[in-house]
């Protein structure tokens, strides 16, 4: 009885915490950073601020609030849903360099009823698609005018697809099933969107989703958990993105081949990213830390952005691994903007790259998102494990002990 009383008290306390965190104001976070005379703006825009008129666009309105990562029984909303952008200030105006959608896992994993959990996962996936459409203003306008629009999304899960420690294997299954249910071949789906007059309007979209999962924590990269399961999803998604011939020297097919056939301005960058991804895949470099834990995940999101698809990425909570992915993307995007070259997979940032990374880690909005979700700022990716061999390469990548500690913050004191 004492154990049961403790369990009930803990659950009641947690529910109260969730209610408190959800009902805080969830507002857009904007930070600027300067490097080599260039000014960049990082913006994290929460679902509550995804508006065409005065209200947010979602049928189940957020009303200025949010859904924190601890709200694991919510079947109406995606957890921790934000649009993340980085822009450069050029010729008196801001030019968007990257825009994507970040969120928690598409699985209300503490819901016991499997049918209800599946319905919840599909509702969450629809919200991510709605946010993805919002991130493409021209496409959104066409959809609101009655056109059935094609929406390409590259989803990059960052979970460890194994149930050995925790339930992330089941969560990955829930997420993949939700994406599959929305993307049967030729399937049109109807989304309800609140238009500028505040009325719910049905829009028609034909979603195409390349759904990846790439484990990035110590369990995956040091102990090998979940790699085989993840790669069974990844090979299919790579075929969608790059065509059936995944040899590094092969001409890209799939979505990338279609994009390159138009001889776009970014032809070279797209080609290099495609080649890097195929090199990583061929040599299983994404199975090891190798100096860069997010090497595959980050390049998939960048490639999606370059070919005008919507990149979306998530871990379980949408704050720690998701936040580190956000920072790695922005580091590489700013480096590319400065040097016009892409870093090789597995390379540690050089001195300038480390400076950019340090500035991004402190000024990307990720510490604020952690605080919004838990009441405390800090990223749990930053760990000091014993034995030392289990540590990921983050101290080397950041290159400054004080900044590493600042980013780690109080995360080790926070559960899940």
Curated annotation (Swiss-Prot):
Span(s) of short sequence motif CX5R motif: 315-321
Main location: secreted
This enzyme's EC code(s): 3.1.3.-
GO molecular function per UniProt: phosphatase activity
InterPro entries named among the record's database cross-references: IpgD/SopB
Keywords of the record: Hydrolase, Secreted, Virulence
One Pfam match: IpgD
Top EC group: hydrolase
Active site: 315
Recorded GO CC terms: extracellular region
Disulfide topology: none
Location within or outside the cell: Secreted
Coiled coil region boundaries: none
Entry function: Converts phosphatidylinositol 3,4,5-trisphosphate (PtdIns 3,4,5-P3) to PtdIns 3-P and prevents the transition of PtdIns 3-P to PtdIns 3,5-P2. It is one of the known effectors injected by Salmonella into the host cell and is required for invasion and for an efficient generation and maintenance of Salmonella-containing vacuole (SVC). Alteration of the phosphoinositide composition of the plasma membrane causes membrane ruffling and actin cytoskeleton rearrangements.
Entry domain remark: Contains the consensus sequence Cys-X(5)-Arg characteristic of Mg-independent phosphatases.
Family as reported in the entry's similarity comment: Belongs to the phosphatase IpgD/SopB family.
Protein's name in the database: Inositol phosphate phosphatase SopB
Organism listed in the record: Salmonella diarizonae
């Amino acid at each position: 009885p004492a154990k049961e009383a403790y369990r009930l008290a803990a659950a009641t306390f947690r529910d109260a915490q969730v209610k408190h965190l959800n009902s805080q104001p969830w507002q857009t976070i904007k930070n600027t950073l300067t490097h080599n005379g260039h000014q960049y703006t990082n913006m994290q825009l929460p679902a509550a601020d995804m508006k065409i008129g005065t209200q947010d666009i979602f049928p189940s309105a957020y009303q200025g609030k949010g859904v924190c990562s601890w709200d694991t029984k919510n079947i109406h909303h995606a957890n921790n849903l934000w649009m993340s952008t980085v822009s450069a200030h050029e010729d008196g105006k801001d030019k968007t360099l990257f825009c994507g959608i970040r969120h928690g896992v598409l699985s209300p994993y503490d819901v016991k009823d499997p049918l209800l959990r599946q319905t919840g996962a599909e509702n969450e996936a629809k919200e991510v698609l709605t946010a993805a459409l919002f991130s493409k203003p021209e496409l959104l306008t066409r959809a609101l005018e009655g056109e059935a629009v094609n929406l390409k999304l590259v989803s990059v899960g960052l979970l460890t697809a194994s149930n050995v420690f925790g339930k992330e294997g089941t969560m990955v299954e829930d997420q993949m099933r939700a994406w599959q249910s929305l993307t049967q071949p030729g399937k049109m789906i109807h989304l309800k969107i609140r238009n500028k007059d505040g009325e719910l309007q049905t829009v028609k979209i034909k979603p195409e989703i390349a759904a990846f999962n790439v484990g990035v924590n110590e369990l995956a990269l040091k102990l090998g958990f979940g790699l085989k399961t993840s790669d069974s999803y990844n090979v299919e998604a790579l075929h969608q993105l790059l065509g059936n011939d995944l040899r590094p020297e092969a001409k890209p097919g799939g979505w990338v081949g279609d994009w390159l056939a138009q001889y776009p301005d970014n032809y070279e960058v797209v080609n290099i990213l495609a080649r890097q991804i195929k090199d990583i895949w061929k040599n299983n470099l994404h199975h090891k830390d190798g100096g860069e834990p997010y090497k595959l995940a980050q390049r998939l999101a960048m490639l999606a952005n370059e070919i005008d698809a919507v990149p979306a990425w998530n871990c379980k909570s949408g704050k720690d691994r998701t936040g580190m992915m956000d920072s790695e993307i922005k580091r590489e995007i700013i480096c590319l903007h400065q040097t016009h070259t892409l870093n090789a997979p597995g390379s540690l940032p050089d001195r300038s790259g480390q400076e950019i990374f340090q500035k991004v880690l402190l000024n990307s909005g990720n510490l604020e998102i952690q605080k919004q979700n838990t009441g405390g700022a800090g990223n749990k990716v930053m760990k000091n494990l014993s034995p030392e061999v289990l540590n990921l390469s983050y101290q080397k990548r950041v290159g400054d002990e004080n900044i590493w500690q600042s980013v780690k913050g109080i995360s080790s004191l926070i559960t899940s």
